[in-house]
């Protein structure tokens, strides 16, 4: 990805996932109204436009999209009529990772939509033929039998890796093993090779379902609070990737899937606090879709003790400023969610740290 000239050595990476509501059009006539743009329970167009404008105001060098860019199943027409309307102006800077809503069927809340297996996602980001067939290579990585959109790129002194964790899909033969030679195992081997050959000082990796959750009060209080991928089959990949990144001294992991903002303490692969060698995790799933609820204890503390700070009342994008050997983060709300508290827009989280390399 071409980088614009800079007068200094800092770069801006905007990061967010879980963004665009399903448009209310003829193709989605059977979808319940509560799941489409215009539903009062969703952020809808107002939220996705607010977060897009917030990201644009950051003047980013790149935009890390953390999956579930388009609900409910990410058809190409959905991308064109919803995501594109708000986020299209940043398209050439967007470096996406897919989410479950781009691959899997959606059969909840009275809906029954066929999974797209990544077709709409790749067609939107990589371009497509006149017949709508996605191009095999492009901005979202390769769309082939041997590679389903994992890739890496450099921004300044930073190496950034985008991964596809949607292994419980036809594209991956519904195979979430990282060791059996299947497609996910090949992706995991690619990650190991990519990290071994990296010569940049600092590394960020991102994918959709998080390794460590802030949403599930049961899993958050286990001795190992890792129930990766929010108790899903994708957890095998999340665990394996965290081990590789930890061994390679990666600096940050970014995820979406859980619809709020949460920052975690540096952790080892078992979910233990590790201030010396651990990797901080940021969940930034506050791009526009209906917000989730953080898991808390009776005293108001977070159920997962590794959560430092979090908010589930507003939509927003995280700004990462990448320096040569350090970084800073800044998260500010862009729009309050439905039924938000009076203090929702006063939340903020910012800080800085050195990169691990």
Which functions belong to the PLM regions below?
Residues 1-77:
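N-terminal active-site segment of His-dependent metallophosphoesterases
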Residues 13-15, 63-65, 96-97, 205, ...:
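Residue-level marker for buried hydrophobic side chains located in beta-strands
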Residues 15, 65, 154-155, 322-324:
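Generic beta-strand structural signal
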Residues 18, 67-68, 99-100, 163, ...:
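Active-site glycine-centered loops adjacent to acidic/histidine catalytic or metal-binding residues
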Residues 26-39, 72-199, 203, 217-235, ...:
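Extended active-site neighborhood of metal-dependent phosphoesterases/phosphodiesterases
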Residues 58-59, 198, 248:
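Active-site charged/polar residues at nucleotide-handling catalytic sites that mediate phosphoryl
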Residues 205-212, 251-261:
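Histidine-centered catalytic micro-motifs
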Residues 301-357:
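A short C-terminal boundary segment appended to hydrolase-like catalytic domains
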């Amino acid at each position: 990805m071409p980088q614009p000239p800079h007068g200094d050595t800092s770069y801006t990476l905007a990061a967010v996932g879980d963004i665009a509501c399903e448009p209310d059009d003829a193709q989605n006539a059977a979808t319940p109204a509560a799941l489409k743009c215009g539903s009062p329970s969703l952020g809808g167009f107002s939220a996705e436009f607010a977060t897009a404008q917030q990201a644009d105001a950051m003047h980013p060098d790149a935009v890390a999209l953390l999956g579930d860019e388009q609900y409910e199943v990410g058809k190409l027409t959905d991308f064109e009529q919803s995501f594109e309307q708000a986020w299209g102006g940043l398209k050439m800077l967007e470096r996406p990772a897919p989410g479950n809503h781009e691959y899997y069927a959606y059969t909840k809340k009275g809906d029954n939509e066929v999974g797209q297996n990544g077709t709409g996602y790749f067609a939107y980001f990589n371009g497509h033929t006149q017949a709508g067939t996605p191009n095999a290579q492009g901005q979202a990585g390769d769309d082939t039998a041997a590679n389903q959109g994992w890739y890496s790129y450099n921004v300044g002194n930073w190496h950034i890796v985008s991964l596809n964790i949607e292994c419980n899909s036809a594209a991956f033969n519904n195979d979430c093993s990282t060791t059996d030679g299947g497609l996910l195992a090949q992706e995991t081997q690619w990650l190991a090779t990519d990290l071994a050959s990296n010569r940049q000082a600092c590394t960020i990796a991102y994918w959709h379902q998080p390794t460590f959750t802030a949403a599930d009060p049961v899993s958050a209080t286990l001795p190992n609070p890792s129930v990766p991928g929010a108790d899903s089959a994708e957890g095998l990949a999340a665990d394996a990737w965290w081990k590789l990144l930890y061994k390679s001294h990666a600096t940050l992991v970014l995820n979406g899937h859980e619809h709020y903002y949460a920052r975690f303490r540096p952790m080892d692969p078992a979910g233990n606090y590790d201030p010396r060698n651990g990797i901080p995790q940021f969940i930034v799933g506050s791009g526009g879709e209906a917000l989730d609820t953080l898991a808390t204890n009776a005293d108001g503390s977070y159920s997962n003790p590794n959560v430092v700070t979090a908010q589930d009342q507003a939509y927003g994008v995280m700004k990462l400023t990448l320096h040569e050997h350090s970084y800073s983060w800044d998260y500010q709300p862009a729009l309050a969610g439905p039924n938000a508290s009076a203090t929702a827009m006063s939340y903020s989280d910012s800080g800085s740290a050195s990169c691990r390399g």
